[in-house]
Amino acid sequence: MKDNSSAFNSSIYDSKVNAVLPYYTEYNKQILDLAEVFGIKNSKWLDTGCGTGNLALRVAEKFADVKLVLCDPSAEMLEASKSKLAECYNVKFRNISSQELDYKNEFDIVTAVQAHHYLSIDERRKAEKNCYDALKDGGIFITFENIAMSTEQSEMLAIARWKNYMLAHGRTEEQTENHMKRRGTELFPITIEEHIKILKEIGFTSVDLLWGSYLQAGFFAIK
């Protein structure tokens, strides 16, 4: 039985994720670069759906004065994060989902990486409204998600590219098919346009695309 919503148990997640998510390590690079330009000296940073703590570790290493709060609905993922950040100070952990966040005007930055595409539209709205509420005025929300293409034709092309990528990175034909079957059953990706629309409706004053490739995209939104 899996111990989280992703395709891999927490114990093997780090060793497998790059085989199914093209440019996975680029997500963190883009987030750190934007955060640095945004200015985060002595900031509070909430990472919801923190997983095994890959982003948080990079944040702690690059921005030593940042106070981190890491949340994840999977206790096993959170334990992996605790182990990875055992030597880092200024880090707190909570075993809750984005839908359960209860912060108000507390953080300068909120991130959610590969966390909300497991949710229905209503659940996604609640999760991202909670992220909005957690931010101080002028704070920034950065999220990376699996996405859907805007047309059936472009979706087919993107899926074909993704399949080729997985096969080239050691996944078997059966494993690749199983990953693709998760779309629409375990994963519920939405288009770039839908992402931007929801974030604006929640109340963010500035919403834009940060990065995109294959079937993944990053967005940033300012409160």
Predicted regions span which residues?
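Conserved beta-strand signature within the Rossmann-like core of class I S-adenosyl-L-methionine
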Residues: 138-146
